[in-house]
């Protein structure tokens, strides 16, 4: 009898838990649906207001600023702007300047909010290039304050907003600030990719070269990576840095530049370091071997064939890849393809097939 009561009790508890879970799931889905419809309604309302020129109606303007104190409403507004930008680019360009100046009024409010909410405001400024139209004396102090924030989201979005301002001196000031506070410096890729969104590249890069020696090596590497993707016009400066720098990471960044833009003056350095097997410097050797893929010649062929048998897997792989990219005749590679080094043979065959497949696919 007791056992039956215990089983019945557990059965009732289990049914209760199942019913509770079903009820909460229904409520959750209902709330999600209601919120989604509300957001869509707000989005359409904001889109219409933007097209009617928000700033012409002062009463409407004040109401919107108050609504945008809510981060969710701010992001809904950004979604509406995104739709206008994609569907009606001309109307967007006509109205974004006045809206950008309106958004300045949110800065004192968001300065008192959490880091994530501050980052959201900077994000909206960045994606619509609002900082181009805003008063620098109002928006820049806010962005530079975010730049010193411990939150990566704040720093990244502040940088993006500064890049979108198209103000070269503000960008240089931001880079100098990050260099002076190295613990705040974001990952090299974040910094380089962000700088690529800055439109005035050919005006910015000379200023970077002018101050390059004043930056820390880590910052220099990020800037050299940026220059590699941004312009082919700096071979002399890159060559000088390649030959004079003693920092391996900086040398690797320069080597990658010459792997992207051919310059025969870099070949002696590439050949020397591709062959040099110094302990702790295999990354530089690896970068040189990879760069040699665009410098055909008997010395290149000889070194690559030698390094395909390297003890280092990365060096071996890049040597095989460079040989394949050079479109070397298979007869010239017969000593490897028919040799006793099974690992070198398999690696080379794999890379030859991969390059052939890429060419077949038009890549």
What is each PLM-predicted segment?
Residues 105-130, 134-142, 151-160:
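Structured extramembrane domains adjacent to transmembrane segments
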Residues 47, 61, 74, 235, ...:
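Short amphipathic alpha-helical segments that mediate assembly, nucleic-acid/protein binding
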Residues 1-6, 275, 349-363:
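Short, Lys/Arg-enriched, disordered terminal segments
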Residues 79, 87-97, 119-132, 156-166, ...:
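Structural detector for internal amphipathic alpha-helices that build alpha-solenoid repeat scaffolds
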Residues 23-113:
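N-terminal topogenic membrane-targeting module
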Residues 113-115, 150-152, 182-185, 215-216, ...:
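Short inter-helical turns and helix N-cap capping residues of alpha-solenoid HEAT/ARM repeat scaffolds
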